[in-house]
Each structure stands twice: as structure tokens, then as C-alpha cells.
């Protein structure tokens, strides 16, 4: 969970004014980061033709970083450097560092990315690997960490897990000839609620400790935006002899993480949401150092290491090209790599990470807490539970959520409200049957963005056709 220790921000009476929002922007120490991104224009987001960015001075309000982050300006520079390397020196790009390029030689690129990602997730550099995509990485990690026995075979997960997680777990159970109806345990909220309390999760762990082998939860629940207490849940589950994994798709680049200190067994994430690495970008995985050790006590040719699905790129670089078919894994998460990673994908990833390298998750989280609290304050301002046609289903506690607020609309409102928002140049995510997921992102969103969004959102709710 986040290390934010301050209480929930309190806003003055004039917080509903555009002038107040502008004053928050003027005092924002991260304001300059917005200029490191290409903000889509209002005209372009509603256009059906391919358009060049930067032709309009009227940017949209982009609150969809929880689905896909926007493009860093560095991306084009990094991609151009990668293409120039390929065109100018060909295969030598694997082994030669070029002066003037922001990128290392190709065989070191994944390590360059992993070193930066490790700071985002609170890990040692060797505990992180830049590779694959989220679901593929979850499959690799489950193959290594899920070790069912006749008595301990269950996997615990949340009741509304993203389908890829659900499918991955089902397939691993089937791989071991287990019935998901017997071996998959869904942890859900109380009837009529959306938040799953830590106490309820711990009670499920207690209830199934004798028969469960592993628990896999999201760091942040994608639908509700709830941030789980990763540290407490991890420690408790491990005390009951469960292996603990985390899907950090919505936590990476969003909240402070300390995976090493929290003793997490394994984790995986994508990088295209708050990470801004591009659609379908390369993902990352974490394996705690205690699981990534390679023991040579019985000789150089008899390494002992945690079982995993192996590939040549996970072999130690010093022997990778010896072709003797004696696998000696890279110590740490790098030993889970399979194939030569795409240098083009890594260029996009490294470009996005170059922005994070200029700040810290602590600073980003500080602004994020303020942005989301301001959004919540304006949404609830001058309304009551009885009068407002929506409910915020994300926890009110800043330490139990990330950037996102999930706004549940009354039945029948979602399509029209979503259409009105898009017509107004606002990009946010909708989830059936009635949720608008709004995610102000500290790297490129402003408090004025929040003010404008709420003004337009409430105006959309006041449209006559929505009141009938």
C-alpha cells in the first residue's frame, strides 16, 4: 500500500472555482512534466482521419491513463535512434554502444529498462525483468510458483479479476488436472458493496489455508480502483504457508510500491497504462531475490535454481553463445527471460521510463492524492446521497485507492453521459453496466483539467434527456 501518511486533503470554500484550480496548478512542482507528453487534441479524438499531433492548440482532457497512457515526446526520439542504429550498423547494434544514442546496445537494453522499472516498483534491479506481456508473464510465473499437492491446490483471487488473470489461473488448474470449481476461490465484497476489506481477505486466507497453495490479487482492482494492502496481505498469507503473487497492471506507475521490502514472492505488470509505454507495450515481472538465486555449490556444471520454463535468453550472458545446452540462468528475474526481446518495443519502454527517471514515485503519488481528492470533492460538492445520480464506488480513504475514481451512474445513464463527455473533448473509460472510470494522472493532468471535467460531467447529467 502507499506510504502516504497525510490525512485526506481538505479544500476551502472557494475550491469550486476555476481560479482555485489554477492556483493549485501554479503551485504544482511537477507542472513542467505535462510538456513532456503529446496531449491529443479535442479535434483529433473525434476525427476518423489519421492526423498529425500538435496541429491544434485545444488539447482534450485525457483521464484515461488507467487504460492507455498518452505518448511521451521522448518516444519518437528513442524510436528514431533505434531505427538509425539498425539501419547504420545492422547486427552490430547488439554489441555496440553508439555515441549520441539514449539507448544501450541491444543485448543490454532489457537491463537498462529493468533498472529504471525497479525504482518504480521498489525492487532491486536484479529482481526485475523487462519482458513479454502481462498475461504471458503471469503464465510463466504461475508455472514456476504454483506447486499444487493433493491437499494444497487452491488459488485465491478476487471476484472481479480481469479476464486475463481469471483465464490464466483456470488454464493452470486444468494443466494440473484440477477442477476450477473446486480449486479456484473468489474473494468478493459483501452484498451490495464494492470494496473488499483487508479483514475479509485475511479471513478467506484463514478459511482456506490448509487447502490453498497460492493467492494472486491485483494491487489495484481495475473496476473499483481499490488499492489493496499489499504489505499486510502478503505477510499474512505467507504466515499461513501460501505463495503470494500480485498483478500490478493498475498499480505500476500509479502508487508507491516496495515489493522487495514487502517480501512479495512474485509480481507482473503491463507498462502501457500509467507507464505510458504505448499500446501493447512490453511488460515487466518481479521475482524476489530469494527465489532468483543460483546455487553452484555442486559445481559450475550443476547449477540449482527454482524451476521455471526456460529459454536461451534467460541464460547467463557469459555462456549464452556457447551453445552447449547447459542452462545456467541469469541470477534474479532475468533468468525467467525466454527470447531475444524486441529492441523496438524496448525503445518505447525506455522512452517512457526516461520521464519517470526525472522524478520519484513519492512525488508523483503526492500530487496524485491531491488530484483525486480534488476530483472527489468537486463531484460531491453541493450534492447529497439522495440527490446525486451517481455513487463513487472507489474507497474514500486516499491510502486505499490510486489515481482512479470509479463513478457508478444510475441505470440507463452510461451511454448518454459517455457520449456527452466525448463530444466535450473528454477521454475517460466506461465499463458496463454503469461505471465511468476517471483517472487524473499526475505526470500530465492538471487541477484545471479536473475542474473542467466535473463542470462538464455535471452539465451532462443535467441534460433534459438524461433526467427523464
Curated annotation (Swiss-Prot):
Keyword Signal carried by entry: no
Keywords of the record: Cytoplasm, Hydrolase, Pyridine nucleotide biosynthesis, Pyridoxal phosphate
Positions contributing to pyridoxal 5'-phosphate binding: 134-135, 162-165, 247, 250, 272, 312, 340
InterPro entries: Aminotrans_V_dom (IPR000192), Kynureninase (IPR010111), PyrdxlP-dep_Trfase (IPR015424), PyrdxlP-dep_Trfase_major (IPR015421), PyrdxlP-dep_Trfase_small (IPR015422)
Pathway linked to the protein: Amino-acid degradation; L-kynurenine degradation; L-alanine and anthranilate from L-kynurenine: step 1/1; Cofactor biosynthesis; NAD(+) biosynthesis; quinolinate from L-kynurenine: step 2/3
EC number: 3.7.1.3
Enzyme class, UniProt record, top EC level: hydrolase
Cofactor(s) the record lists: pyridoxal 5'-phosphate
Main location: cytoplasm
Function: Catalyzes the cleavage of L-kynurenine (L-Kyn) and L-3-hydroxykynurenine (L-3OHKyn) into anthranilic acid (AA) and 3-hydroxyanthranilic acid (3-OHAA), respectively.
Subunit structure comment from the entry: Homodimer.
PANTHER family: KYNURENINASE (PTHR14084), KYNURENINASE 2 (PTHR14084:SF2)
HAMAP family hit by this protein: Kynureninase (MF_01970)
Protein name, UniProt field: Kynureninase 2
Taxonomic source organism: Aspergillus oryzae (strain ATCC 42149 / RIB 40)
Species lineage: Eukaryota, Fungi, Dikarya, Ascomycota, Pezizomycotina
